[in-house]
A protein has these predicted regions:
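Non-transmembrane, aqueous-exposed alpha-helical and coiled segments at domain scale
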Residues: 2-455
Length: 455
């Protein structure tokens, strides 16, 4: 397209501006209360409306004392096993844990050595993309948004699958395992295409190594020299494990259930989940944390001065700093109260990486903000449950220390969560025999039709 010429696919014309005013009609807030609408499918206390059953994972953030709900330390279980024990197991045995976790979530049981080796071999074999896919699909139409490229690639894979629309359990499982294997490749290649064609950087396309773990392959594919340390790979692996699954009610997983209930194919269901995860209210929070800390570092002169940090946090809550949204990003969670177990696990190991990278001072800043933010929020806001750091608080810091570009933060979430989506898709197909269709109350008044000459 000629420079300075208007782009009809991008330009909002004055005519569109005028028409948009006709769309800007909000429903009276009082009607939501009148009809007891569970907005966001949540009750007034923040608890989600019960929409289904699952045995894939369980989140525990409350306990009952004297018939009263009392906040407690958060717990997360994958197929009934405490996430703390899962992490402890592969850390103590000096193994990578993502592949084992994927097996557990998909099949409901921990693999023995032979089963794990077979599953890892399957993932390695499936990491190869169809012939010319990279050239024809990824390189020819690079996007500034990696999630859009990833969703497009997933939908395009439908065309390469002779049984794409078959939703029998064995075929869906095969498709899901292939997508789990391919997500790291599709994500990194999408970034490499963007980095080359949009930013003019050198193009590096490494082939995936079937002998490497998922975390190792990500670093191998992304870095020009393919080099990484063991600690780097282990921390990335842990982040993938902790992002792999989080119940059926989070937006992208619920999207998977809703779309799967229609009987559609796997590629369409997973693409829909990706589009949900792309939303900044869901998958983009760790980027916001890093950007918030960048702003904090630019405005707080002395990182060891707690009073100066506290003043900045107050400005965040008062909508006077950063994006003026009134939020301290990385603090608080829709479900967890006193603690997010995933954040607690990450925080124990992030210090090691900060020492390897010479980022101890920055780590201490994160730890100070985590401690002070709880106090500041407690003083300024009415809290019905505890507030604590969530997984986004430290994951973005880990990714930045690994030198991962911001454009890949949300795709990394997807690389992990495709496991949970896959398990929930199969669970929906096995147990849900009705299309998900909640009710909406119509509140528009009845009107008479007016002939066009009388309007």
């Amino acid at each position: 397209m000629v420079k300075d010429m208007p782009n009809k696919f991008s330009e909002v014309t004055p005519e569109i501006e005028e028409l948009a005013k006709k769309c800007n009609k909000k429903i009276d807030e009082e009607l939501f209360a009148k009809y007891d609408v569970k907005r966001g499918l949540r009750k007034r206390n923040g608890e989600g409306v019960l929409a289904g059953l699952t045995d894939i994972s369980m989140i525990n953030a409350y306990t009952m004392i004297d018939r009263k709900i009392v906040p407690c330390e958060g717990k997360l279980y994958y197929r009934g096993i405490d996430i703390e024990d899962i992490v402890k197991g592969f850390i103590e045995e000096d193994r990578f844990g993502f592949e084992e976790t994927a097996y557990l979530l998909l099949f409901g049981e921990l693999p023995n050595k032979d089963a794990l080796k077979q599953f890892e071999g399957m993932l390695g074999e499936y990491r190869q993309l169809p012939t010319n896919f990279v050239r024809d699909i990824i390189m020819k139409a690079p996007s500034r948004d990696m999630m859009n490229t990833l969703a497009r690639s997933v939908l395009t894979l439908f065309s390469y699958d002779d049984n794409a629309s078959d939703i029998s359990l064995p075929n869906v499982l095969r498709q899901c395992i292939q997508l789990i294997a391919l997500f790291p490749v599709l994500s990194v290649y999408a970034y490499q295409a963007y980095n080359h064609y949009e930013r003019g950087e050198s193009l590096f396309i490494h082939l995936p190594d079937p002998e490497l773990s998922t975390a190792e392959n990500i670093l191998h594919l992304l870095r020009p020299d393919s080099k990484y340390t063991k600690l780097e790979a282990k921390l990335l692996d842990m982040a993938l494990v902790l992002h792999a699954e989080h119940g059926g009610g989070n937006n992208s997983t619920f999207t998977t259930h809703v779309v799967s209930s229609s009987g559609t194919d796997t590629y369409s269901a997973i693409a829909a989940a990706l589009c949900s995860l792309k939303g900044p209210k869901h998958g983009g929070a760790n980027i916001k944390v890093v950007q918030m800390f960048d702003d904090l570092k630019a405005n707080v002169k002395d990182w060891s001065n707690e009073e100066e940090i506290r003043e900045y946090l107050l400005k965040l809550l008062n909508k006077e700093a950063f994006d003026k949204a009134g939020l301290i990003y990385g603090m608080g969670h829709a479900v967890y109260s006193l603690s997010d177990p995933r954040s607690k696990i990450l925080s124990r190991f992030v210090k090691q990486l900060s020492e390897e990278k010479g980022k101890e001072e920055e780590y201490q800043l994160y730890a100070t903000v985590e401690r002070l933010a709880k106090q500041v929020i407690g003083e300024k806001r009415k809290i019905y449950k505890g507030v604590s750091a969530n997984i986004d608080f430290y994951s973005g810091f880990i990714y930045s220390m690994l030198g991962l570009p911001h454009q890949l933060y949300t795709p990394l979430f997807a690389i992990a969560r495709i496991v949970g989506w896959s398990a929930h898709r199969m669970e929906e197909l096995m147990n849900g025999n009705r299309i998900i269709r909640p009710a909406y109350k119509a509140v528009a008044p009845h009107r008479e039709y007016t002939p066009i000459d009388e309007r």
